[in-house]
Amino acid sequence: MSTTLLSAFYDIDLLYKNEKALNNLALSTMLDKKAVGSPVSSTNSNLFPGFLRRHSATNLQALSGSTNLAKFCPNNNNNPLKDPAVSSTALLNRENKFRDRSFSENGERSQHLLHLQQQQQQQKAGAQVNSTRYKTELCRPFEENGACKYGEKCQFAHGFHELRSLTRHPKYKTELCRTFHTIGFCPYGPRCHFIHNAEERRQAPGAGERPKLHHSLSFSGFPNHSLDSPLLESPTSRTPPPQSSGSLYCQELLQLNNNNPCANNAFTFSGQELGLIAPLAIHTQNQSYCRQPCSSPPLSFQPLRRVSESPVFDAPPSPPDSLSDRDSYLSGSLSSGSLSGSDSPTLDSNRRLPIFSRLSISDD
């Protein structure tokens, strides 16, 4: 029983000492005239009367005292300091809320900053070029009197060595000035971007003649003869007109026979046998060209000319037993000659190919 009473008196004594310490702290803060801050609590003015002092160690003491007081008043629901962690953070946040505005600027400081800013702007404006027409026109006072009151700061050119070329719009002086040509007067004068006189007319870029297409071909497939410069001609214009297909085919056969006679051919041919093969190739190639439908007109070719001089090369070879028959041979050559075109040579029955003469001799 005695121990219970002693503990109760001890608690009351401790509570009294804490309240006394808080009252002393409140009086010291009230007497401090240099205090700047905001009210901390309005619900419990006995706990925190007045204002907390800025940047002092007494704030921490007040916070510790408030936490101790909250321990001895657990049943007080109206106590805002029930949770020590929440109360301490809330007080610190309220204290730091107006810290940015603690320094008040007077009128002299603001005027001084404004004056400095104006000076900096003037210096930048003096260093930069004020206009895009800087030094693009001659200074009239300098030309008339030989002196200018602005000196080096003048925006006009003092002589042709200072004159700069002005970058103009691409359509500058390419259209007529409506005001000048309707009224007879333009307020812009010589600075107008449109044409006042015929001497001011400029040729618009892109309005000149377009370059001719040097790689264009005529309908017949040959290059146009009206081209000016031969530098950009197409590869087809450099080549001569195409030869007949039969002559090209014969040349290929001769080259194959001369260069590599046994590489790709199963049989080797002599020069006379090649002369026999070439007209036959011409005839079969003509027939294949006529059978294919042409969607667009091909390049024009010259009429096919015969490679060999003999008139009896167009007929396909017949069996050996019928070679001695002169009538059938001549009729076949005549029919093939009529197919070959208008420029085929006339029939000469006296001249015969040596191979046919040998075959006819062997038959006899």
From Swiss-Prot:
Primary location group: nucleus
PTM comment: Phosphorylated.
Tissue: Remains unlocalized in the egg and early embryo. From stage 21 (late neurula), expressed around the pronephros in the anterior crests, pharyngeal arch, hindbrain, mesodermal tissues around the pronephros and tail-bud. This expression pattern is maintained up to the tadpole stage.
Location relative to the cell: Nucleus; Cytoplasm
Single Gene Ontology BP annotation: cellular response to tumor necrosis factor
Zinc finger residue ranges, C3H1-type: 133-161, 171-199
Record-linked SMART domains: ZnF_C3H1 (SM00356)
GO cellular component: a single term: cytoplasm
Keyword Ribonucleoprotein: yes
Composition bias, Basic and acidic residues: 102-111
Keywords: Cytoplasm, Developmental protein, Metal-binding, Nucleus, Repeat, Ribonucleoprotein, RNA-binding, Zinc, Zinc-finger
Family matches, as InterPro entries: Tis11B_N, ZFP36-like, Znf_CCCH, Znf_CCCH_sf
Domain of life: Eukaryota
GO molecular function, a single term: mRNA 3'-UTR AU-rich region binding
Span list, region Disordered: 102-129, 308-350
Biased composition (Low complexity): 113-123, 329-348
Residue ranges of the motif RNA-binding: 133-138
Region feature RNA-binding, mapped onto this chain: 150-191
Function: Zinc-finger RNA-binding protein that destabilizes several cytoplasmic AU-rich element (ARE)-containing mRNA transcripts by promoting their poly(A) tail removal or deadenylation, and hence provide a mechanism for attenuating protein synthesis. Acts as a 3'-untranslated region (UTR) ARE mRNA-binding adapter protein to communicate signaling events to the mRNA decay machinery.
PANTHER family: CCCH ZINC FINGER/TIS11-RELATED, MRNA DECAY ACTIVATOR PROTEIN ZFP36L2
The protein's name: mRNA decay activator protein ZFP36L2-B
Species of origin: Xenopus laevis
Gene: zfp36l2-B
